[in-house]
């Protein structure tokens, strides 16, 4: 993927989505304010109530305007029939170039203790992650937005860091934030079901250029006021209830191998609700096998041969145990 090629600007595509989100703030139960430095803050679930619809729209913003997110019945888990479905005709750019929460943002000058991972089109403007060199992509924009899975807006030091890295003024930045415990927060996290498959494909060394289309779905997890339980539910929705289909321009051997490598069943930590796993490692994410962060089931279709390969399995019992 090269910036010189005719790839779309994810900021040009997602910008109107951000403005519509702000315009519809009253009906979506969002709170919009301006920080002291001029940045626009959109509270989608911290002090504001937020909504599932807000989470759905935020997920489309995270995808850089290159994906659709729908919520509908007939999901993969019978007892939790409403599912979040994500589709993108450019899944690599949408998921890895925009949606992936890869920008570590911390208050390094104050004592707020703020930390969040930045997601969305603003990542591609700053392009501070090594991933953008691999993708060969960097976006340019006069305004941009970042989505944060956080219980509050970023402090001035973090806003300044983002502005400097992006080459923009604080007033050109929009920060959309919602904690995992909220309706919007939990919805936008479950909407990462396709993204985790793309991240896993990247991790196992599959040729990203060969992934030409993708769709994924996972059950809409009920929010919980406890952070650990809320985080566990959103992870379990994907790890044990997520199903992804990738369409690849690859031969059968590579497609089959990818289907076998993608699912969460490849992880040594597979088999227990995420909250239990998290407690087992005393809350240290780095002690959890990274292979766990994957969809439960993977379907890979080779567009060269028409053959389809499958890996993994849904675990309705574990989803029930997590959501109950």
Curated annotation (Swiss-Prot):
Record GO terms (molecular function): methenyltetrahydromethanopterin cyclohydrolase activity
Biological process per Gene Ontology, one example term: formaldehyde catabolic process
One Pfam family matching this protein: MCH
Metabolic or biological pathway, per its Swiss-Prot or TrEMBL entry: One-carbon metabolism; formaldehyde degradation; formate from formaldehyde (H(4)MPT route): step 3/5
Principal location class: cytoplasm
Subcellular location: Cytoplasm
Keyword terms of this UniProt record: Cytoplasm, Hydrolase, One-carbon metabolism
Domain of life: Bacteria
GO CC entries: cytoplasm
Substrates-to-products reaction catalysed: 5,10-methenyl-5,6,7,8-tetrahydromethanopterin + H2O = N(5)-formyl-5,6,7,8-tetrahydromethanopterin + H(+)
Subunit structure and binding partners: Homodimer.
Similarity-based family: Belongs to the MCH family.
Function description: Catalyzes the hydrolysis of methenyl-H(4)MPT(+) to 5-formyl-H(4)MPT.
Name used for this protein in its record: Methenyltetrahydromethanopterin cyclohydrolase
The gene coding this protein: mch
């Amino acid at each position: 993927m090269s910036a010189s090629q005719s790839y779309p600007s994810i900021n040009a595509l997602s910008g109107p989505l951000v403005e519509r989100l702000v315009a519809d703030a009253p009906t979506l139960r969002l709170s919009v304010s301006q920080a002291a430095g001029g940045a626009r803050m959109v509270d989608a679930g911290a002090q504001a109530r937020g909504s599932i619809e807000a989470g759905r729209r935020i997920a489309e913003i995270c995808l850089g305007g290159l994906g659709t997110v729908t919520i509908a019945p007939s999901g993969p888990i019978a007892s939790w029939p409403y599912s979040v479905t994500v589709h993108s005709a450019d899944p690599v750019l949408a998921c890895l170039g925009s949606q992936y929460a890869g920008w570590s943002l911390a208050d390094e000058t104050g004592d707020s203790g703020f930390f969040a991972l930045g997601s969305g089109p603003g990542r591609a403007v700053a392009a501070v992650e090594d991933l953008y060199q691999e993708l060969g992509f960097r976006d340019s924009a006069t305004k941009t937005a970042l989505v944060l899975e956080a219980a509050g807006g970023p402090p001035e030091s973090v806003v300044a860091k983002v502005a400097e890295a992006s080459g923009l003024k604080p007033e050109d930045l929009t920060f959309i934030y919602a904690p995992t415990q909220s309706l919007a927060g939990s919805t936008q996290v479950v909407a990462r079901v396709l993204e985790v498959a793309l991240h896993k494909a990247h991790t196992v060394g599959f040729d990203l250029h060969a992934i030409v289309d993708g769709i994924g779905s996972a059950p809409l997890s009920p929010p919980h006021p406890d952070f650990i339980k809320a985080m566990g539910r959103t992870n379990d929705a994907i790890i044990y209830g997520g199903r992804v289909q990738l369409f690849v321009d690859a031969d059968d051997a590579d497609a089959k191998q990818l289907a076998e490598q993608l699912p969460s069943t490849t992880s040594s930590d597979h088999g227990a609700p995420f909250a239990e796993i998290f407690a087992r490692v005393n809350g240290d994410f780095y002690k959890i096998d990274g292979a766990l962060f994957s969809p439960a089931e993977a379907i890979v279709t080779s567009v060269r041969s028409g053959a389809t390969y499958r890996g993994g399995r849904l675990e309705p019992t574990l989803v029930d145990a997590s959501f109950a």
